[in-house]
């Protein structure tokens, strides 16, 4: 009779959008007065950002510029895991930031408990780095989406394949 509906909960960062945001941020840095003559750079190496600047203050400003450009390009900034600031060559400082892709086991468990605590008749299962939610009623699935969106998760989640 009624076909089961489902959707997937994923956590992805679009790397082309990150690259575009980096290019825009570098363009702004090259024209800003407070960055004149400084050795500031942002690069993307696979799924890791590398920020380099003269000192920690300029590094924090560099990070602020990058975050503002990422927000404008709709890239989730929750999925950026910043490392510690370290000394680099030439008297500069470097900070690495890992782009978190996918939902790890701990966050998948948190999402599952949110779904179970909702009390709705839906099933959830962890599949690699995503969580699939199935149920007969589409309204229940939409309530699950709003419950997961409202939860305070350490990563940004997207909802795809709503069938």
UniProtKB/Swiss-Prot annotation:
Is Metal-binding tagged as a keyword? no
A GO molecular-function descriptor = nucleotide binding
Q: What GO cellular component is one of the record's annotations? A: cytosol
Q: Which domain of life is it from?
A: Bacteria
SUPFAM superfamilies of this UniProt entry?
A: YajQ-like
Q: Which UniProt keywords apply?
A: Nucleotide-binding
Disulphide bridges in this chain? none
Q: InterPro entries per the record? A: DUF520 (IPR007551), UPF0234-like_C (IPR035571), UPF0234_N (IPR035570), YajQ-like_sf (IPR036183)
General function of this protein: Nucleotide-binding protein.
Protein family per UniProt? Belongs to the YajQ family.
Indicate what this protein is called per its UniProt record: Nucleotide-binding protein BSU11020
Taxonomic lineage of the native organism: Bacteria, Bacillati, Bacillota, Bacilli, Bacillales
Instruction: Tell me what gene encodes this.
Output: yitK
């Amino acid at each position: 009779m009624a076909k089961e509906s489902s959707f997937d909960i994923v956590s992805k960062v679009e790397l082309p959008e990150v690259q575009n945001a980096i290019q825009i941020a570098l363009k702004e840095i090259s024209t800003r007065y407070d960055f004149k003559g400084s050795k500031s750079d942002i690069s993307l190496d696979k799924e890791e950002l590398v920020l380099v600047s003269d000192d920690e203050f300029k590094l924090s400003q560099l990070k602020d510029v990058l975050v503002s450009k990422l927000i404008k390009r709709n890239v989730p900034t929750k999925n950026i895991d910043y490392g510690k600031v370290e000394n680099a060559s030439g008297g500069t400082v470097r900070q690495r930031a890992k782009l978190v892709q996918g939902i790890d086991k701990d966050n998948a468990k948190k999402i599952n408990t949110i779904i179970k605590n909702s009390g709705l008749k839906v099933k959830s299962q962890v599949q690699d780095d995503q969580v699939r939610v199935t149920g007969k009623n589409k309204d229940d699935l939409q309530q699950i989406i709003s419950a997961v969106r409202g939860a305070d998760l350490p990563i940004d989640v997207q909802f795809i394949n709503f069938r």
